[in-house]
């Protein structure tokens, strides 16, 4: 996500946001370190009204207990309710099969499902339900503005249980609260012919009849599924075997803007593949929109972004840092935002020197979670500028080529998995031993407030 980065500068303008009421954590006592439920297979069919703002459908999720103990329940995240919360929910669930649904909690963004029977380790279960989704009239990753419907974090997905318990963190408008495991999606989208659809995954089927178009998208090893619907125009090309498409509403975005974004996305893709390894998705869809503060939002294989140089490169970089190398975005937001911030400089002028960072307070740490930044929102830019500065410092110490070699190995080791701070620190320590004899990792982490 990019919502704090200034135009062409590496200094970030930190905005003060209104914070919604804090909601206490709901984590269970940890019983297993292995994340579960895993190997989820989502099957979704959804139908849009004429405007693309009301969707009805059915979702079926088959998942495995990848933990060491039986599961008698799971949790689903209903992130579509994040903005309106319980007072104005955007998604409603009915006709559930495979478990009993409790009342939603955490601002109606989390719901417990008691399974029909205890799920033993290594066994599978299936839960299905009908849903109605109302896309709100607003700018944002989930909203409709200027005739463009963005469905980011809209479909219900499984919450994660790991060594910290169930992750049931609250929705935060200025940050990301999302944490999910790599899964597969098969999503069939039924729309009026007038609506085009850009989505996660590849389109594998398409048919048209009676004024409507039915498209089926498939994606494997992805953490979520997002789509955009509108009467789009598009610019497309193939980059190193990867289809790249830039989607735009011509009444909102000029064709000349879409063309330079196409060139920028292509350059970013080529640069990042050389630096971090093969692009992790089948294709890249860039949906241009007018998100607030020249911002953007990343999803597997698709990004929603305002047309700015920094934002486009930043969101494409997230295809490696979060979409492929996953992390708990609420508990450790620096693990994707710092990396995307540093990476966004590579297509233009690689950031390889940053010897000093002006911390906004003595208490903030680069490794703080969103819980801290909800109390101190003006310090949230630390995970962008502070983390980017730290990585630039490492790039300068190691040399850019060696640093990229380290990052390629790190990305390979955690591809389609979940990383944490200790994994990155270990990668740096190994690289330091190889490239910088005498590198004092402990002093380095203290200096950059990595705990």
Question: Which positions does each model-derived feature cover?
Answer:
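N-terminal, polar/Ser/Thr-rich
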Residues: 23-56
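Amphipathic alpha-helical substructures
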Residues: 54, 67, 380-451
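Zn2+-dependent metallopeptidase catalytic core
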Residues: 66, 118, 175-179, 183-197, ...
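Solvent-exposed beta-hairpin/edge-strand motifs
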Residues: 71-99, 152-155, 190, 194-195
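A surface-exposed beta-strand-loop module
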Residues: 83-148, 211
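Extended, low-hydrophobicity, Ser/Thr/Pro/Gly-biased non-transmembrane segments
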Residues: 130-226
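Catalytic zinc-binding patch centered on the HExxH motif and its immediate surroundings
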Residues: 260, 274-281, 288-310
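Zinc-dependent metallopeptidase catalytic helix centered on the HExxH motif
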Residues: 300-357
């Amino acid at each position: 996500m990019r919502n704090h980065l200034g135009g062409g500068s590496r200094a970030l303008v930190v905005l003060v946001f209104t914070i919604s009421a804090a909601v206490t954590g709901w984590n269970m006592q940890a019983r297993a370190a292995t994340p579960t439920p895993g190997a989820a297979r989502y099957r979704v069919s959804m139908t849009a009204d004429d405007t693309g703002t009301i969707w009805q459908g059915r979702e079926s999720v088959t998942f495995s207990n990848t933990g060491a103990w039986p599961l008698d329940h799971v949790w689903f995240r209903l992130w579509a309710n994040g903005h309106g919360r319980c007072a104005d929910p955007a998604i409603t669930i009915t006709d559930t099969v495979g478990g009993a649904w409790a009342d939603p909690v955490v601002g109606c963004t989390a719901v417990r499902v008691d399974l029909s029977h205890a799920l033993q380790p290594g066994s599978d279960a299936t839960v299905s339900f009908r849903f109605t989704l109302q896309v709100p009239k607003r700018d944002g990753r989930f909203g409709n503005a200027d005739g463009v419907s963005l469905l980011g974090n809209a479909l219900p997905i499984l919450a994660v249980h790991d060594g910290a318990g169930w992750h049931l963190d609250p929705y935060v408008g200025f940050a990301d609260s999302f944490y999910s495991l790599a899964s597969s999606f098969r999503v069939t989208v039924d729309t009026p012919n007038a609506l085009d659809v850009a989505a996660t995954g590849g389109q594998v089927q398409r048919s048209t009849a009676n004024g409507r178009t039915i498209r089926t998208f498939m994606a494997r090893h992805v953490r979520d599924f997002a789509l955009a619907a509108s009467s789009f125009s598009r610019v497309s090309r193939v980059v190193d075997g990867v289809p790249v498409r830039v989607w735009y509403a011509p009444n909102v975005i000029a064709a000349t803007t879409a063309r330079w974004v196409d060139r920028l996305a292509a350059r970013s893709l080529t640069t990042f593949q050389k630096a971090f390894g093969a692009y992790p998705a089948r294709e890249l869809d860039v949906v241009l929109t007018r998100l607030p503060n020249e911002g953007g939002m990343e999803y597997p294989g698709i990004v929603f972004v305002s047309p700015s140089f920094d934002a486009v490169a930043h969101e494409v970089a997230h295809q490696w840092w979060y979409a492929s190398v996953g992390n708990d975005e609420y508990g450790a937001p620096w693990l994707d935002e710092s990396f995307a911030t540093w990476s966004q400089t590579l297509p233009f002028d690689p950031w390889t020197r940053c010897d000093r960072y002006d911390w906004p307070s003595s208490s903030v740490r680069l490794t703080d979670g969103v819980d801290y930044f909800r109390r101190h929102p003006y310090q949230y830019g630390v995970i962008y500028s502070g983390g980017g500065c730290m990585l630039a410092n490492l790039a300068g110490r190691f040399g850019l080529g060696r640093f990229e070699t380290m990052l390629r190995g790190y990305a390979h080791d955690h591809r389609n998995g979940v990383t944490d701070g200790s994994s990155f620190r270990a990668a740096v320590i190994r690289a330091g031993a190889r490239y910088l004899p005498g590198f004092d990792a402990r002093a380095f982490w203290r200096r950059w407030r990595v705990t």
